[in-house]
């Protein structure tokens, strides 16, 4: 599905949206009518043995249409935006070579940005540096590391909460490895390549006209996860000696809150409330990312006929029937 620099770029349809916005339903509706394969754009779905809390597509759903970039790594390992970009570009070509149509679907906007806009020259993760920062945080607390970050990269520190451990750790890691603030490196021109330039990525964005409706869905879905055995899932992960709350997998929304409950740090109701709140905050960040994409095609994800609207929009993109 690649194209020469002189030819017209191949359109790649992308179904993006916040958590609980109906992406799976829309993708499956399209799969019933088109020979598609779904490439997941979701940083949580890459992990094996994390099914309930990530709302992973069911076995039946995955049997109905091929899914990619799901269950590809162990929770003890990390998966970067650079790895996603390479995998997604490879899969797009492979799916097209089979005579089928790739559909990118998910809500990890950092992955989508890396795919469509290229990568910054940020250093890769270093386990030794991360272990040292984790030890410092265990001794002094993440607010102290946030204060340290403010001294070397005030721009990044200003946009992070003092307990945002994952992002504070990454920003300090980048500074320690490169000697430059992450904010400076992110402001530098991104690296592009001919392979991505062969494609025209068209984002179809599922966004709520009434955020309260989406919030209600989030609460219902979190309760359904709890009823489906989410706590037992986290307990099985927690028994593994190689997993801990410092890992990206265990920082996924819901998992941290359930882990803290199992540690005895919170009661059940507090765990539930914190899990729902964290999911709502994730939803807010996802919508903010989407609204920064002027090229997106918006579908109201809380409309009564949202799935039909999304299906119609996706088919218009695939058939090149969009207004110019």
From Swiss-Prot:
Q: Which residues bind ATP?
A: 17-24
Q: State the reactions this protein catalyses.
A: adenosine(37) in tRNA + dimethylallyl diphosphate = N(6)-dimethylallyladenosine(37) in tRNA + diphosphate
Q: What are the record keywords, sorted?
A: ATP-binding, Magnesium, Nucleotide-binding, Transferase, tRNA processing
Q: Which InterPro entries match?
A: Dimethylallyltransferase, IPT, P-loop_NTPase
Q: Which residues bind substrate?
A: 19-24
One of the GO biological process terms:
tRNA modification
As cofactor, the record names: Mg(2+)
Q: What is its EC number?
A: 2.5.1.75
Q: What ranges does the record give for the region Interaction with substrate tRNA, renumbered to this chain?
A: 42-45, 166-170, 251-256, 284-291
Protein origin, superkingdom: Bacteria
Which of the seven top EC classes does this enzyme belong to? transferase
Q: Where is this site: Interaction with substrate tRNA?
A: 108, 130
- Single Gene Ontology MF annotation: ATP binding
Subunit and partners: Monomer.
Q: What does this protein do?
A: Catalyzes the transfer of a dimethylallyl group onto the adenine at position 37 in tRNAs that read codons beginning with uridine, leading to the formation of N6-(dimethylallyl)adenosine (i(6)A).
NCBIfam families according to UniProt: miaA
Q: Which family does it belong to?
A: Belongs to the IPP transferase family.
Report what the protein is called: tRNA dimethylallyltransferase
Q: What is the lineage of its organism?
A: Bacteria, Pseudomonadati, Pseudomonadota, Betaproteobacteria, Burkholderiales
């Amino acid at each position: 599905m690649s194209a020469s620099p002189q030819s017209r770029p191949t359109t790649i349809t992308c179904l993006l949206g916040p958590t609980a916005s109906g992406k799976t339903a829309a993708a499956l509706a399209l799969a019933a009518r088109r020979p598609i394969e779904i490439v997941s754009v979701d940083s949580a779905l890459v992990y094996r043995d994390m099914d309930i809390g990530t709302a992973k597509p069911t076995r039946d759903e995955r049997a109905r249409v091929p899914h990619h970039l799901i269950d590809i790594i162990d929770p003890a390992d990390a998966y970067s935006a650079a790895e996603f970009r390479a995998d997604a570009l490879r899969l797009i070509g492979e799916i097209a070579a089979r005579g089928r149509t790739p559909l990118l679907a998910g809500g990890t906007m950092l992955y989508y940005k890396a795919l469509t806009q290229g990568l910054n020259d940020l250093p890769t993760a270093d386990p030794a540096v991360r272990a040292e920062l984790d030890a410092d945080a265990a001794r002094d607390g993440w607010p102290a590391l946030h204060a340290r970050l403010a001294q070397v990269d005030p721009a990044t520190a200003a946009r992070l909460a003092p307990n945002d451990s994952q992002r504070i750790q990454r920003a300090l890691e980048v500074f320690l490895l490169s000697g430059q603030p992450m904010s400076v490196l992110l402001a530098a021109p991104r690296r592009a390549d001919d392979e991505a330039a062969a494609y025209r990525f068209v984002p179809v964005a599922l966004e709520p006209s009434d955020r309260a409706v989406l919030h209600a869905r989030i609460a219902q879905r979190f309760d359904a996860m709890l009823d489906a055995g989410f706590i037992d899932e986290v307990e099985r992960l927690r028994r593994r000696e190689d997993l801990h709350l410092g890992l990206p997998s265990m920082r996924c929304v819901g998992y941290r809150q359930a882990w803290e409950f199992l540690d005895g740090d919170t009661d059940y109701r507090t765990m539930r409330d914190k899990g729902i709140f964290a999911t709502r905050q994730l939803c807010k960040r996802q919508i903010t990312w989407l609204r920064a994409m002027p090229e997106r095609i918006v579908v109201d994800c809380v409309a009564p006929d949202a799935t039909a609207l999304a299906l119609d929009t996706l088919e218009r993109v695939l058939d090149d029937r969009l207004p110019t």
